[in-house]
Amino acid sequence: MITERQSNILNLIVDLFTQTHEPVGSKALQSVIASSSATIRNDMAKLEKLGLLEKAHTSSGRMPSAAGFKYFVEHSLNLGSIDEQDFYQLVKAFDFEAFKLEDVLLRASQMLSDMTGYTAAILDVEPARQRLTGFDIVQLSSHDALAVLTLDESKPLTVQFAIPKNFMNRDLLVLKGIVADRLLGKDVMTVHYKLRTEIPQIVQKYFTVTDNVLDLFDYIFVGLFRETIFVSGKVAALDYAGLVTYQFLDEEQRLALSIRQSLSEEEMATVQVADSSEPALANVTLLTYKFLIPYRGFGLLSLIGPVDMDYRRSVSLINVIGQLLAVKLRDYYRYLNSNHYEVH
């Protein structure tokens, strides 16, 4: 455990270093810390011995270690802080008309990435927490059709497919009836379970050849079990992390899993400093913020960047964007659920 003065010294060094990326000497701290230069140097030496500070090769100053950043985050960082300038700037950026949920999510990830210079990712409600509330098949021609799946009465998913060659005219209606009878209204995990257990038995009752029918079921429904995730600023990873992290960001389902694992069920926000179990994220910082998606659940907004990022600034930005997201989505879903008639 460190003393209050040592904690103040560490906090100040973190703040100065994240703004200048230059090692900090004892003289730079004297105007804020009411102690002699010798006392400050002794405290800096103790912090170095504890592994919270480290020497710079080209300077007599000190800079925070990964452990020092982690200590700062755990003991001094206010995860609820907001900068008013960020708020007013981002309010203007959120003043746009959204035609679908994805427009709002993508805009949020782009803004967070643009304003930090790092990588931002945003996730929709976890698939397991969604329900299949609508299903239809629209035949486009004699050879292809479009399946329209609706989640939580508001999120559409469309899948275009070639009609199997052995299908008769009635078979698409039969398939639609099976879905309506057995899968509609069920949560996604139940849908997944029934596709593996109950549906194969039912298909045998209605179809002579079942293999391609079951393949079609899998093809239509596989999208239900994938995370909806938008990632912005991937190229920035080459600057703050390297090729391994950059390549990992293209594996969006693995990235989504790592983000979900960084936050417990009870937490609304968290910061992982070089602490991810995923090797590609083991040497970076992962900030994650949970935001409300009305009527449906929670989404996650994450910022991925270097260990020596400006934490106060990053936390402010992710908080502001998260709060504006909730407001924007509330208005969006309120509009979807309203009776909107325009009289001329």
UniProtKB/Swiss-Prot annotation:
| Keywords attached to this entry | Repressor, Stress response, Transcription, Transcription regulation
List the Pfam families hit by this protein, alphabetically: HrcA, HrcA_DNA-bdg
Check the record and name the InterPro entries matching this protein.
Answer: GAF-like_dom_sf, HrcA, HrcA_C, WH-like_DNA-bd_sf, WH_DNA-bd_sf, WHTH_HrcA_DNA-bd, WHTH_transcript_rep_HrcA_IDD
Presence of keyword Chloroplast: no
Top-rank taxon, per record: Bacteria
According to its UniProt entry, the protein's GO biological process terms are: negative regulation of DNA-templated transcription
User: Could you confirm whether the keyword Membrane appears in this record?
Assistant: no
GO MF term set: DNA binding
Task performed by this protein: Negative regulator of class I heat shock genes (grpE-dnaK-dnaJ and groELS operons). Prevents heat-shock induction of these operons.
Give the family, as the similarity comment puts it.
Belongs to the HrcA family.
Return the protein name: Heat-inducible transcription repressor HrcA
What is the species of this protein?
Streptococcus equi subsp. zooepidemicus (strain MGCS10565)
